[in-house]
Amino acid sequence: AYFSDETGEYELYLLENKDGAKPRQITKESSAWKNSAEWSPKSSHVIYSDRTMTLWLVDVLTGKETEIDKASGEEIRDYTFSPDGDWVAYSKSSPNYQSALWLYQISTGKKHQITDAVFSDGNPVFSNDGKFLFFLSNRDFNLTFSSYEFDYLYNNATRIYAIPLLNDGTKLTPFVK
């Protein structure tokens, strides 16, 4: 998968890895700038986001695009597939300008918010065995006094956290049933 402006617009193309293969244009007549594309583990889907703050799922065989979610404040930039390829984890900003983690299940088309937007959570990554979802969160308030600005600051607020998954690695617990 790659992006090109061959048509005059920035579009997503797929190119099979073999001699003589011709590129196949997936998105058409899109005026929105697109962010990085991620392949599913089984190479059946690609996800990408764009400047309209939308996260898209593309079926590689049919070229069908499905809107996963749309943010209201900032672009969706953090997204990843689960090892089995059925789940997409991503972070999305909330009206309070904090971000929460979400899961989208490809087989059902359902999405679930899995962290609240009290803190800023992002950069989700599934463990290789599918048993954990790791993410970064700004929730450690190491209040200290700034020696330069005569004010308080929060230093080293970001930490790595993990959410345990069920043994089969396909469902999140206790958030998704």
Regions found by a protein language model. Give the residues of each.
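Hydrophobic beta-strand positions that form the internal "hydrophobic ladder"
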Residues: 1, 43-46, 85-88, 133
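Multi-bladed beta-propeller domains
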Residues: 4, 13-35, 58-77, 92-94, ...
